[in-house]
Amino acid sequence: MFKPVLGILGGGQLGSLLAIAAKKLDIRTVIFSDSEISPGKYFSDDFVFGDYTNINKIKEFIYKVDVITYEFENIPYKTLEIINNEKKVLPRPNINKIVQNRLHEKDFI
């Protein structure tokens, strides 16, 4: 039976909690973080360290996962677009673009 691998952009507290919850559901996780000492490193099945704009690291991450989410809104929009062209990103990158600007976010809501 196919079990998708969940990619998580960001390895802070929320990324760690997401990896812990996924493990309880027998879902493998890979965390991509721009911090080598990210706490998510200790809760995921695999870990990719690199700048969120490093295309080689982005490709390494994409190769390891089936579907991607992110733990916070400060992932560069362009990075999410690049990833979304290869693998599905949820929430969609256009939502991230809205929440990166609090005035746009208020208008959207």
How should these model regions be labeled?
Residues 1-107:
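ATP-binding N-terminal substructure of ATP-dependent carboxylate-amine bond-forming enzymes
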